[in-house]
Amino acid sequence: MLNFEQFLKKIDQNYYENEFEVRYGQTVMNTLHRVWPEKYKQLSGGEYDCFYNDGLAESTLKLLQKEWK
């Protein structure tokens, strides 16, 4: 599994490859699903699910940083 810094780089890479097609929160959650599917399932549909709300992305990333394996 990637470390947290590599995860952030992967998010940025995915976001800029799909610029203007996918929102940042979507990119965070999609990347999380590929990298750590169990954590994605825990967050999906909850207060830290930033897929539909980019405003939650910062909080989601802070939580993930604390819980990263």
What do the predicted segments below correspond to?
Residues 1-69:
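C-terminal alpha-helical interaction appendages
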